[in-house]
Amino acid sequence: MPSEFQKRKLALAFYKYDLSKDGILEAKDLELQGHKVADLLKVKQGDAEREKIVSAHKAVWDAYFKPGDTDGDNKVTLDEYAKAVEHYYSNPGNSHELALEVNKSVFDSIDLNGNGQIDSVEYAVFLRSLGVSEADAKVAFERLDTNGDGYISRDEFAKNQVDYFISDDPEAAANWFYGSY
């Protein structure tokens, strides 16, 4: 059973992605996020790069959020999201491997240049598309780049994602996964 702190972080993540601000997650929220990323990068409407960015975010819906839609209405409520997250991370022994698999599309949507690493600019664009300030995005990246090499690897990303949801430590670096908490 998640602690109150863990529930708060889970709700924060859910509402960050709820870009339509209607209390549910749908494919349109991820499509909107893709357009926000493209806007932040000044990619014009109709440009092939914009479509690639939006498609990557639609893939996040399909791989990460849609499996939590237990009633098949193409919408994910906070309760459905909480149950999906609890299922993903209920076994800490294999949660890192599962996070690598489940979060591949999320990582790929942030890794805009496709080099297999996320740099500070890419992470800032991701967080800013979710409404996080530039200053908080900078702090978040510094916290999540656990080896200090200037990049977040797939392993660092997966570990931080798992720790974000399972850690009950208010000082854990992973708490910054979605910006300040």
Model regions: which residues?
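Plant-biased recognition of short, low-complexity, intrinsically disordered N-terminal tails
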Residues: 1-15
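Helix N-terminus capping/helix-initiation residues
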Residues: 3, 47, 173-174
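Acidic (E/D-rich), amphipathic helical modules within compact regulatory domains
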Residues: 16-18, 22-93, 105
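EF-hand and EF-hand-like Ca2+-sensor regions
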Residues: 60-114, 124-181
